[in-house]
Amino acid sequence: PIGMAAGFDKNADVYNSLFKLGFGFVEVGTVTPLKQYGNPKPRVFRLVEDEALINRLGFNNLGAKNIVDRIKQNNPIGLLGVNIGPNKDTTNRIGDYVENLKAFHNIADYITINISSPNTEDLRNFHDQKKLNELLKIINNEKKNLKSIVPIVVKVSPDIDDREINKICEVLLNNDIEAIIISNTSDSTRDRLKNIQGHQRGGLSGKPIQDKS
């Protein structure tokens, strides 16, 4: 099936319309425990000559409670995933993932742990083998406490080498993670971009990262 990735329907507004268009699954979010505006505008840049986009949205969303209410009021007619992440100003990022798991475990068909957005400072530190293992063990323990069987998926960055990929896959397998999403946007060098906006800070997507992703 072809699905709609997180980032399009951030606030669970149109997932059923997307199902009616023929998408096999839809992933809403990224959702944080508390509502947040994200980064100041402008924060999306279209690079026409490069067939690319740069975004620095910064997890703008209405917060877990509001999005839970929306999903409960509009029963999904297809496979609905929820992509979760921490609030920008949180002092406990793992705790934020756990709070989101508690909120969505009984209404999502799967939950994606987003550790790969380049627009939340140091979020990609969770690509470290020890830190990722700690996060996933806590998530799995909370699943047991909740008596939940919701599948857990992890979304990774394209800016990792083969050695890192192997380590991450080992951690995912050891923690019974159901799937891996490849990939988020890239914060790699922009030297070859033609558009004058190519210098903008944020995650690069589109043709320039096709091979990398």
Where is each model-derived feature located?
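Glycine-rich, proline-tolerant flexible connector loops at the mouths of alpha/beta enzymes
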Residues: 30-41, 53-54, 109-129, 189-191, ...
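A gly/proline- and charged-residue-enriched helix-loop-helix capping module
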Residues: 29-79
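Active-site-proximal loop/turn and secondary-structure-junction residues that shape catalytic pockets
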Residues: 10, 32, 86-88, 117-119, ...
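Non-catalytic positions within long, well-ordered alpha-helices that form the structural scaffold/packing
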Residues: 18-19, 104-105, 173
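Active-site glycine- and acidic-residue-rich loops that bind
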Residues: 6, 86-98, 125, 131, ...
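Metal-dependent enolase-superfamily TIM-barrel catalytic cores that perform enediolate-based chemistry
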Residues: 96-144, 157
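Hydrophobic faces of well-ordered beta-strands that scaffold small-molecule active sites
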Residues: 2-6, 24-28, 55, 80-84, ...
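Glycine/Thr-rich beta-alpha phosphate-binding loop at enzyme active sites
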Residues: 118-131, 165, 171-213
